[in-house]
């Protein structure tokens, strides 16, 4: 968290040094050496933090674009979302758990959910076929 608090602070102090750097004779050589950093920026660590925040900001913007297709699920109510996505697979997993009664029920349910999380409709059809055969 400290990196996040340092990132917004580092650009603010660098806005004042350019005015002071103009009074210094070596200000132009500093500006040419570090074009992305302010001429009077104190430590190079602050520059690295400032530069690392730009890719982080870009990465934060990119997932927002990637999440737009899933906005359909974000717009539906929580109950409806859970009923459509989680409940069917979880229900079948709980039924299998009750039938088999394994010694480690949490591990059994976790592995069941991972195995059957791809397609709930396919699982419903196969579970119905297994129940009919029994």
From Swiss-Prot:
One Pfam family matching this protein: Dpy-30
InterPro entries reported in the protein's UniProt record: Dpy-30_motif, DPY30_SDC1_DD, Sdc1/DPY30
Effect of deleting the gene: Viable and fertile with no overt disruption of metal homeostasis.
GO cellular component terms, semicolon-separated: MLL1/2 complex; MLL3/4 complex; Set1C/COMPASS complex
CDD domains per the UniProt record, alphabetical: DD_DPY30_SDC1
Keywords: Chromatin regulator, Nucleus, Transcription, Transcription regulation
Residue span of region Disordered: 1-81
Extent of the signal sequence: none
Subcellular location: Nucleus
GO biological process: chromatin organization; heart development
Record keyword Transcription regulation present: yes
Feature: compositional bias, Polar residues: 71-81
Low complexity: compositionally biased ranges: 31-68
Tissue specificity note: Expressed in larval brain, gonad, imaginal disk and salivary gland and in adult brain, testis, ovary and salivary gland.
Subunit (UniProt): Core component of several methyltransferase-containing complexes. Component of the SET1 complex, composed at least of the catalytic subunit Set1, wds/WDR5, Wdr82, Rbbp5, ash2, Cfp1/CXXC1, hcf and Dpy-30L1. Component of the MLL3/4 complex composed at least of the catalytic subunit trr, ash2, Rbbp5, Dpy-30L1, wds, hcf, ptip, Pa1, Utx, Lpt and Ncoa6.
Name this polypeptide is given: Protein dpy-30 homolog
Organism of provenance: Drosophila melanogaster (Fruit fly)
Phylogenetic placement of the source organism: Eukaryota, Metazoa, Ecdysozoa, Arthropoda, Hexapoda
């Amino acid at each position: 968290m400290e990196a996040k608090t340092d990132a917004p602070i580092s650009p603010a102090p660098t806005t004042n040094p350019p005015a002071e750097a103009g009074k210094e004779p070596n200000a132009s050589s500093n500006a040419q050496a570090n074009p992305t950093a302010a001429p009077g920026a104190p430590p190079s660590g602050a520059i690295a933090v400032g530069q690392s925040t730009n890719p982080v900001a870009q990465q934060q913007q990119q997932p927002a674009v990637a999440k737009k297709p899933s906005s359909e699920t974000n717009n539906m109510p929580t109950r409806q979302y859970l009923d459509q996505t989680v409940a069917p697979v979880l229900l079948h997993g709980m039924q299998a758990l009750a039938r088999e009664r394994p010694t480690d029920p949490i591990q059994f349910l976790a592995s069941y959910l991972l195995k059957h999380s791809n397609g709930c409709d396919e699982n419903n059809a196969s579970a119905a076929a297994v129940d009919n055969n029994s």
